[in-house]
From Swiss-Prot:
Species name: Homo sapiens (Human)
SMART domains: ZnF_C2H2
Primary location class: nucleus
Region (Disordered): 1-89
UniProt KW keywords: Activator, Metal-binding, Nucleus, Repeat, Transcription, Transcription regulation, Zinc, Zinc-finger
Gene Ontology CC: nucleus
GN (gene name): ZXDA
The protein's name in its UniProt record: Zinc finger X-linked protein ZXDA
Self-association state and partner proteins as the record states: Self-associates. Interacts with ZXDC and CIITA.
Length: 799
């Protein structure tokens, strides 16, 4: 900020040099050449202390204060306590045309120049008019530098005005030249001998050639009211002398060159609307760069070729050069960190990361992380097993838990070279080996040749690898342990551990996709089980449990078989038959209308007392109870009482269900009806049965079960005595494999059956016991020729 900017188009002071000061001193007044009505232009510089807003008062504040009205300079002031300071302001007057009157002439010929120093609220005494006695009545703070008429012979174009003012008992030299006002501390020799500046207030004009001077240095004449400026409306506490001098220096100079006194030199920023002051010159220069940088001025450029960075200060350039030299003088003090930085600012930014290290803490290992993202990435390392096997293909960074998973992934890199494609309609999978395609085709055909040989298991699989993986359950090979402390769970498969690990996160990421269902689960298996509830439509069920006392439905045969093994304890031999029984004829289509005459309890009792053939009895019981095999009770009741024709080729019974043998309903004429339903004790003579004309009934994978035709060796049945036995010669039986079209290995082995009539018992009348044999399908067909007899109570039929 230059003072000429505040005083634009200012006139030049005209005055001559030389001449003395007359004793009587004349008043300075307007020259005759001045235009009428023209008054000097007023400029106000208002220094203020820190208590009033700082030493650098904005220029717009000063201009606002200059426009306000105020009391007269010499108006009476209220008395203030001693020691209080006064605010003050200086008025700069632009010179106007005219000449200063010469010495001895009593007339002013030249411009009028007035500089007023107005006292603050601390003025004392009553002032009215001129004070011949000097400034003593006005107090120590009266400041005045009023040029008086002086004889000037030849005023020059570059004349200067100088004077001395006292501010808070400190004398300052005042110089006004070419429109520029300068204040400076006077040298020691400039003071008069014996003067006491702190005790003698005065208004002093230093003598200088060419300028009018006051006759009495102490005079403070009354000024015209039109030259008085407004006074600050509200009085403020008096600033200290040093602070007031600093404020004055900040207001009066762009660089604040105010002399060598301590605390006086201040440097004011010249930028508009800035007003900041600085105690040292280099501080002002540094501050000016902030204004120039906003205008694109960055004078400090990096000297290294190819860099091109520019900076506003040399310090920033020096700091930048450290990055080229790889110098990192600022090291992180955190223990175990070891990082260093080129600037302290980067170090502070790095230290904030250490301050936030405890914000996100892992609950498993108590390790801390600065962000939630890093904590989440760390937690996955706890809940996922180690993945030591990495893909070796270029550009692929995937890792796997097992070698088999890695091999499976590697095949994906050879998709273009695969030659074996699935020919099943709708399936376009390809494989690099024929054996893999063969395993895949089993998923379409339903073939599962790899059977688990563990006792009571019965699971089968499409490949050996799946079977070996399944056997881990039987061996209790739980090689995948949960790493969470206190959990202790282990799993046979890695994918099971991964699914379990999600439960430790406390989240439920698996959401039911059914519209309107908001169920959420922490494990995928739980979601799978839940999803079945939405499929409980009757039309979607495919299989029903074959056990008559169970009404459960299943969507697949596999789930039905699992249910039978776990819930009904069905053996694997029956499960093997059920798995292959895809074309069994429903028993409801084969039974007669009189099927319900026998209850389930009576059917179970038929197979309850089988000595040494428990598995066979359980098998047949399950078949009967499941509804696969049924018995026509009415036909059984009349089996042995039917009429045998003369050709001895009567059927024992009609083939209804495979194990049931029916006879004709007409009882033989030679036998008493009471033999079967009464109390008379009669019996058959010993006779033999053959299988000449046996009608075969095919039951599919269960094998061919024969309806035997009973032949009597004699034309008429002979009466039986209690000691007689009816035997069946197995040598005369024709194997069923030759009587049916489909040969089944599970065909029941023909057994030698005997009817033993116990002595001292009624054969049929008194609910006698008839014994006949059932073969054991699970036994050895070649080694066993005879079977133990089954005791049947209430009725008799032959299988």
């Amino acid at each position: 900020m230059e003072i000429p900017k505040l005083l634009p188009a200012r006139g030049t002071l005209q005055g001559g040099g030389g001449g003395g000061i007359p004793a009587g001193g004349g008043r300075v007044h307007r020259g005759p050449d001045s235009p009428a009505g023209q008054v000097p232009t007023r400029r106000l510089l208002l220094p203020r202390g820190p208590q009033d807003g700082g030493p650098g008062r904005r220029r717009e504040e000063a201009s606002t204060a200059s426009r306000g009205p105020g009391p007269s300079l010499f108006a009476p002031r209220p008395h203030q306590p001693s020691g209080g300071g006064d605010d003050f302001f200086l008025v700069l007057l632009d010179p106007v045309g005219g000449d200063v009157e010469t010495a001895g002439s009593g007339q002013a010929a030249g411009p009028v120049l007035r500089e007023e120093a107005k006292a603050g609220p601390g003025l004392q005494g009553d002032e009215s008019g001129a004070n011949p006695a000097g400034c003593s009545a006005q107090g120590p703070h009266c400041l005045s530098a009023v040029p008086t008429p002086a004889p000037i012979s030849a005023p020059g174009p570059a004349a200067a005005f100088a004077g001395t003012v006292t501010i808070h008992n400190q004398d300052l030299l005042l110089r006004f030249e070419n429109g520029v006002l300068t204040l400076a501390t006077p040298p020691p020799h400039a003071w008069e001998p014996g003067a006491a500046p702190a005790q003698q207030p005065r208004c002093l004009i230093a003598p200088q050639a060419g300028f009018p001077q006051a006759a009495h240095p102490g005079d403070c004449p009354e000024l015209r009211s039109d030259l008085l400026l407004a006074e600050p409306a509200e009085p403020a506490p008096a600033p200290a002398p040093q602070e007031e001098a600093e404020g004055l220096a900040a207001a009066l100079g762009p660089r604040g060159l105010l002399g060598s006194g301590p605390g006086v030199v201040l440097y004011l920023c010249p930028e508009a609307l800035c007003g900041q002051t600085f105690a040292k010159k280099h501080q002002l220069k540094m501050h000016l760069l902030t204004h120039s940088s906003s205008q694109g001025q960055r004078p400090f450029k990096c000297p290294l070729g190819g860099c091109g960075w520019t900076f506003t200060t040399s310090y920033k350039l020096k700091r930048h050069l450290q990055s080229h030299d790889k110098l990192r003088p600022f090291g992180c003090p955190a223990e175990g960190c070891g990082k260093s930085f080129t600037t302290v600012y980067n170090l502070k930014a790095h230290m904030k990361g250490h301050e936030q290290e405890n914000s996100f803490k892992c609950e498993v290992c108590e390790e801390s992380f600065p962000t939630q993202a890093k904590l989440g990435a760390h937690q996955r390392s706890h809940f996922e097993p180690e993945r030591p096997y990495q893909c070796a293909f270029s550009g692929c960074k995937k890792t796997f838990i097992t070698v088999s998973a890695l091999f499976s992934h590697n095949r994906a890199h050879f998709r273009e070279q695969e030659l074996f494609s699935c020919s099943f309609p709708g399936c376009s999978k390809q494989y690099d080996k024929a054996c893999r395609l063969k395993i895949h085709l089993r998923s379409h055909t339903g073939e599962r040749p790899f059977l688990c040989d563990f006792d009571g298991c019965g699971w089968n699989f499409t490949s050996m690898s799946k079977l070996l993986r399944h056997k881990r359950k039987h061996d209790d090979d739980r090689r995948f342990m949960c790493p969470v402390e206190g959990c202790g769970k282990s799993f046979t498969r890695a994918e099971h551990l991964k699914g379990h690990s999600i439960t430790h996160l406390g989240t439920k990421p698996f959401v039911c996709p059914v519209a309107g269902c908001c169920a959420r689960f922490s494990a995928r298996s739980s979601l799978y089980i839940h999803s079945k509830k939405h499929l409980q439509d009757v039309d979607t069920w495919k299989s029903r449990c074959p056990i008559s006392s169970c009404n459960k439905l299943f969507t697949s045969k596999h789930s039905m078989k699992t249910h039978m093994v776990k819930r009904h304890k069905v053996g694997q031999d029956l499960l093997a038959q059920l798995e292959a029984a895809n074309s069994l004829t429903p028993s409801s289509e084969l039974t007669s209308q009189r099927q319900n005459d026998l209850s389930d309890a009576e059917i179970v009792s038929l197979f309850s007392d089988v000595p040494d053939s428990t598995s066979a009895a359980l098998l047949d019981t399950a078949l009967v109870n499941s509804g696969i095999l049924t018995i026509d009770v009415a036909s059984v009741s009349s089996t042995l009482a039917g009429h045998l024709p003369a050709n001895n080729n009567n059927s024992v019974g009609q083939a209804v269900d495979p194990p049931s043998l029916m006879a004709t309903s007409d009882p033989p004429q030679s036998l008493d009806t009471s033999l079967f339903f009464g109390t008379a004790a009669t019996g058959f003579q010993q006779s033999s049965l053959n299988m000449d004309e046996v009608s075969s009934v095919s039951v599919g994978p269960l094998g061919s079960l024969d309806s035997l035709a009973m032949k009597n060796s004699s034309p008429e049945p002979q009466a039986l005595t209690p000691s007689s036995k009816l035997t069946v010669d197995t040598d005369t039986l024709t194997p069923s494999s030759t009587l049916c079209e489909n040969s089944v290995s599970e065909l029941l082995t023909p057994a030698k059956a005997e009817w033993s009539v116990h002595p001292n018992s009624d054969f049929f009348g008194q609910e006698g016991e008839t014994q006949f044999g059932f073969p054991n399908a699970a036994g050895n067909h070649g080694s066993q020729k005879e079977r133990n007899l089954i005791t049947v109570t209430g009725s008799s039929f032959l299988v």
